[in-house]
């Protein structure tokens, strides 16, 4: 059974937590067009395979898919366009330094509403090796079995 989303959460990148070790998180605003926010509020955003990148002192979110708004007209948005992220200059510089190190990248973890504004939770992540992923799955299965046994006993 899939996990329930917390209130306000519009999209979540659960695969990122499986593929990466998240070392640090930061909240960023996102620049959207009118039809994009309408589509996001309907729940048709997908963070899978998306990443953030520093370009000329600005940060952009690439490869995030937002389905076209159904009631939109011919001026609807491009589903996979690069979207600018709103961060302070020093935060962008700090994240840019971290991603210059080998093996680090910035991945979006969650898309949510906060006081009516759309926010993205970004994670500074280091990729897991294949054996790390297998080990994490084994540990998760053991914890699930222990929880099941404890529930059956009490």
From Swiss-Prot:
Chief location of this protein within or outside the cell: cytoplasm
InterPro entries registered for this protein in UniProt: SmpB, SsrA-bd_prot, SsrA-bd_prot_CS
Entry-linked Pfam families: SmpB
GO cellular component, one term: cytosol
Subcellular locations according to the entry: Cytoplasm
Sorted UniProt keywords: Cytoplasm, RNA-binding
Biological process terms in GO annotation: trans-translation
Segments traversing the membrane: none
Molecular-function annotations in GO: RNA binding
NCBIfam families assigned: PRK05422.1, smpB
Recorded family membership: Belongs to the SmpB family.
Biological role stated in the UniProt entry: Required for rescue of stalled ribosomes mediated by trans-translation. Binds to transfer-messenger RNA (tmRNA), required for stable association of tmRNA with ribosomes. tmRNA and SmpB together mimic tRNA shape, replacing the anticodon stem-loop with SmpB. tmRNA is encoded by the ssrA gene; the 2 termini fold to resemble tRNA(Ala) and it encodes a 'tag peptide', a short internal open reading frame. During trans-translation Ala-aminoacylated tmRNA acts like a tRNA, entering the A-site of stalled ribosomes, displacing the stalled mRNA.
Name of this protein: SsrA-binding protein
The organism of origin for this protein: Staphylococcus saprophyticus subsp. saprophyticus (strain ATCC 15305 / DSM 20229 / NCIMB 8711 / NCTC 7292 / S-41)
Lineage of origin: Bacteria, Bacillati, Bacillota, Bacilli, Bacillales
């Amino acid at each position: 059974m899939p996990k329930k989303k917390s209130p306000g959460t519009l999209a979540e990148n659960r695969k990122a937590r499986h593929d990466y070790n998240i070392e640090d998180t930061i909240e960023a605003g996102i620049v959207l067009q009118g039809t994009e926010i309408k589509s996001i509020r309907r729940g048709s955003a997908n963070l899978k395979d998306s990443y953030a990148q520093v370009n000329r002192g600005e940060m952009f979110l690439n490869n995030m898919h937002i389905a076209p708004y159904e009631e939109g007209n011919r001026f609807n948005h491009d589903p996979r366009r690069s979207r600018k992220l709103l961060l302070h200059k020093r935060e962008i510089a700090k994240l840019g330094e971290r991603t210059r190190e080998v093996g680090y990248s910035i991945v979006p973890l969650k898309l949510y509403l906060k006081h009516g504004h759309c926010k993205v939770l970004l994670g500074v992540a280091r990729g897991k090796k294949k054996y790390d992923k297998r080990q994490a799955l084994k540990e998760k299965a053991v914890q699930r079995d222990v929880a099941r046994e404890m529930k059956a006993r009490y």
